[in-house]
Amino acid sequence: MISVPLLKGKRVLVMGLGKSGTATARALLAAGAGVMAWDDGEAARKSGAEAGIPIRDPSLLPLDKADLLVWSPGIPHTHPQPHPLAEKARAANLPMVCDVELLAQALPGARMLAVTGTNGKSTTTTLLAHVLDECGLPVAAGGNLGTAALDLPELPGDGRYVLELSSYQLELTHSLKLGVAILLNVTPDHLGRHGGMAGYIAAKRRVFDFLTPGGAAVVGIDDGPCRAIVAELDRRGIRVVKISVDSVLAEGVSAPEGVLLDNAKPVCDLKTIPSLPGRHNWQNACAVYAAARAEGLSPKQIAQALATYPGLAHRQELVGEDHGIAWINDSKATNADAVEKALVCYDHVYWILGGQAKEGGIASLEKHFGRIQHAFLIGEATEAFAATLDGKVRFTRCATLDKAVAAARNLAVSDSIPGAVVLLSPACASWDQFTSFEHRGDTFRELVQAFDQGGAA
């Protein structure tokens, strides 16, 4: 746990009692702050109270009695409709931050590296932490991924904090000092929360405002918004390391054919690393290589560490093989852009998709429909996706994940196509049937692993 002694004796409201909010409340209580916490969900309030966190309805409290409001980034505070407490806090001029800001204030001298982008953040964060650790550096990874910011351990002076930062967290952070800031890509996502694409890009761009003098901005240049940001950073005189998987870069890190190139010179063959399949993972590896080089590691050290990466759950995770069929859990793929990165890796796909649809649907994936043997539709998006697939891809309406798994297994075993893959890559949020994409992926894994125990097809 990170100590936040600067808030001793302060009166702090904590809004949201998920992972980050609960960790924040615990850290504040340990520091001697006066904490009042709230969550609109009854179950979260009950869990917080059982953990010893004081629960108070903030609507009944005069906000001029508080010194700070710590906001859980998953709760809207501006768009599409701000939470009433956010509006009251602004009217009362009550400072509003997230837990990452408290981490930055608590550890102003710590070496921090940040990763953001629409897709690939979690893999890049864990891969970078893995490389630093393999090369002998004390490291802790968290933030939007895994461990909440204030649940991270305190590291020795040569330690590195690798932080995955969402656009929501970047909006509520002000004091970070970063040695490396990575922006992988920017494609439409969470637009409702940011008032449109311009607001979303502005939130992502903020990561570079926190670079210390001499710090490195590592930026993917394979999309228009990121190329525009690179041009802006160049004008500001910020050190930029460009990465690409679309073309060879004479200056930068690239891997258009799967061989990682440093200023166009070969370093290692990413295609030989099973845990990093596909161009999207090559982009992640390029970003990690660039960041690790900025931290002083040698190409040989980095290449050796990349080769030992075990992979990350719910990101093209191989969860089983049955009758020669590979079962891939890509539950993290909640939009079409993320799904595309998985589809291009396989030729004979039995595709499980659906859930709570996001803007844009799956029409953009039509160029890859030839890879799909059959689609199995679940959740709220079933009819919308059926309309897109009709006449182009054979599909079955399955309603639920367990029925989709059974149907996919039956058909894939019957077809007996060499190299067949059953791919859970939903192109949707999970909240219509699951609590999170992790819950959805874990359920898929359990269903597949039940095959070994004689589970019914």
UniProtKB/Swiss-Prot annotation:
<dbReference type="InterPro" id="IPR013221">
    <property type="entry name" value="Mur_ligase_cen"/>
</dbReference>
<protein>
    <recommendedName>
        <fullName>UDP-N-acetylmuramoylalanine--D-glutamate ligase</fullName>
        <ecNumber>6.3.2.9</ecNumber>
    </recommendedName>
</protein>
<keyword id="KW-0132">Cell division</keyword>
<dbReference type="GO" id="GO:0004326">
    <property type="term" value="F:tetrahydrofolylpolyglutamate synthase activity"/>
</dbReference>
<dbReference type="Pfam" id="PF02875">
    <property type="entry name" value="Mur_ligase_C"/>
</dbReference>
<keyword id="KW-0573">Peptidoglycan synthesis</keyword>
<keyword id="KW-0963">Cytoplasm</keyword>
<keyword id="KW-0131">Cell cycle</keyword>
<dbReference type="InterPro" id="IPR036565">
    <property type="entry name" value="Mur-like_cat_sf"/>
</dbReference>
<keyword id="KW-0436">Ligase</keyword>
<dbReference type="GO" id="GO:0008764">
    <property type="term" value="F:UDP-N-acetylmuramoylalanine-D-glutamate ligase activity"/>
</dbReference>
<dbReference type="InterPro" id="IPR018109">
    <property type="entry name" value="Folylpolyglutamate_synth_CS"/>
</dbReference>
<dbReference type="GO" id="GO:0009252">
    <property type="term" value="P:peptidoglycan biosynthetic process"/>
</dbReference>
<dbReference type="InterPro" id="IPR036615">
    <property type="entry name" value="Mur_ligase_C_dom_sf"/>
</dbReference>
<dbReference type="GO" id="GO:0071555">
    <property type="term" value="P:cell wall organization"/>
</dbReference>
<keyword id="KW-0961">Cell wall biogenesis/degradation</keyword>
<dbReference type="GO" id="GO:0008360">
    <property type="term" value="P:regulation of cell shape"/>
</dbReference>
<dbReference type="GO" id="GO:0051301">
    <property type="term" value="P:cell division"/>
</dbReference>
<keyword id="KW-0067">ATP-binding</keyword>
<comment type="pathway">
    <text>Cell wall biogenesis; peptidoglycan biosynthesis.</text>
</comment>
<keyword id="KW-0133">Cell shape</keyword>
<dbReference type="GO" id="GO:0005524">
    <property type="term" value="F:ATP binding"/>
</dbReference>
<dbReference type="InterPro" id="IPR005762">
    <property type="entry name" value="MurD"/>
</dbReference>
<comment type="function">
    <text>Cell wall formation. Catalyzes the addition of glutamate to the nucleotide precursor UDP-N-acetylmuramoyl-L-alanine (UMA).</text>
</comment>
<dbReference type="Pfam" id="PF08245">
    <property type="entry name" value="Mur_ligase_M"/>
</dbReference>
<comment type="similarity">
    <text>Belongs to the MurCDEF family.</text>
</comment>
<dbReference type="GO" id="GO:0005737">
    <property type="term" value="C:cytoplasm"/>
</dbReference>
<dbReference type="InterPro" id="IPR004101">
    <property type="entry name" value="Mur_ligase_C"/>
</dbReference>
<keyword id="KW-0547">Nucleotide-binding</keyword>
<feature type="binding site">
    <location>
        <begin position="117"/>
        <end position="123"/>
    </location>
    <ligand>
        <name>ATP</name>
    </ligand>
</feature>
